[in-house]
Design a protein with these regions (language model features):
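A detector of single, family-specific signature residues
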Residues: 1-202
Length: 202
C-alpha cells in the first residue's frame, strides 16, 4: 500500500469510514470497515496521523489507536462541518476530517486518559444527584404547601420544614407516611452528594 500521510476516520457504533491521502494530497485509501476489521487494519498499518470527530466514544478509540503507534487528532464537529464538500455521509465526513486536520490553524481536542474520563463521570453523577435533589425538594415544598406548611426558598430552609411536617399531627396518616418517605429519600440523596463531593475534593 502506498505511504499514507494522514487519515480521516468517521466513526459510528459499528461502521467506520476511512479516507487517507499521501504526501501529494492524493487519495490513496477509501475503506468502510466494521469495528473489528477497522482495529485489525489500523493495528497493522504503519504509524500515521488519524483524525476523529470528538464525540462520546472518541477518546477510548483514540487511546486504542495511540497504543498501535498512531498519532490521533480529535476535532470538534462544528470545526469539521465547513470542510464537507458534498452531501453529508460517512465517506464525505471522513474526507472532511482528513482535510480539516491539515489546516495549520485547526484547534484539536486533547485526548483524555481513562482516569480523566472517570473524573468527568464523577462530575456528571454529581450533577444528576443535584438535579434529583432539586426536583425532590420542589415536590416536598409543593405538597407541604397544599397543607398550609410553607418555608422560604433555599436548601437551608428544607430541614426545618421537614421537622415541622413530622411534628404536625393534624396531617392525614397517609400524608405523614409519604412525607416521611420523601424525607428519607432526601437524606439518602444528600449523603450521596456529600460522598461524591468528598471524592472530588480528595
Amino acid at each position: 500500500m502506498e505511504q499514507i500521510s494522514r487519515i480521516g476516520m468517521d466513526t459510528s457504533k459499528h461502521i467506520f469510514q476511512l479516507h487517507g491521502v499521501n504526501t501529494a494530497e492524493e487519495p490513496v485509501l477509501r475503506k468502510k470497515l466494521r469495528r473489528k476489521e477497522m482495529f485489525a487494519f489500523l493495528e497493522k498499518l504503519a504509524p500515521t496521523v488519524i483524525a476523529i470527530e470528538a464525540c462520546g466514544a472518541s477518546h477510548h478509540c483514540a487511546r486504542l489507536l495511540q497504543s498501535f503507534g498512531h498519532s490521533v487528532k480529535l476535532i470538534a464537529p462544528q470545526l469539521v462541518k465547513p470542510y464537507i464538500k458534498r452531501g453529508k455521509n460517512d465517506a464525505a465526513d471522513a474526507e472532511a476530517l482528513c482535510e480539516a486536520m491539515s489546516r495549520p490553524t485547526m484547534r484539536f481536542v486533547p485526548v483524555k486518559t481513562a482516569e480523566q474520563q472517570a473524573a468527568l463521570m464523577l462530575v456528571g453523577v454529581r450533577d444528576r444527584l443535584i438535579r434529583n435533589r432539586t426536583q425532590l425538594t420542589n415536590a416536598i415544598r409543593g405538597y407541604a404547601g397544599e397543607f398550609g406548611l410553607t418555608a422560604a426558598k433555599g436548601k437551608a430552609h428544607l430541614d426545618p420544614l421537614l421537622e415541622r411536617i413530622q411534628a404536625d399531627e393534624s396531617l392525614p396518616a397517609l400524608a405523614r407516611e409519604l412525607f416521611a418517605a420523601q424525607a428519607k429519600e432526601y437524606a439518602q440523596l444528600q449523603a450521596q452528594i456529600d460522598k461524591v463531593d468528598a471524592r472530588l475534593i480528595a
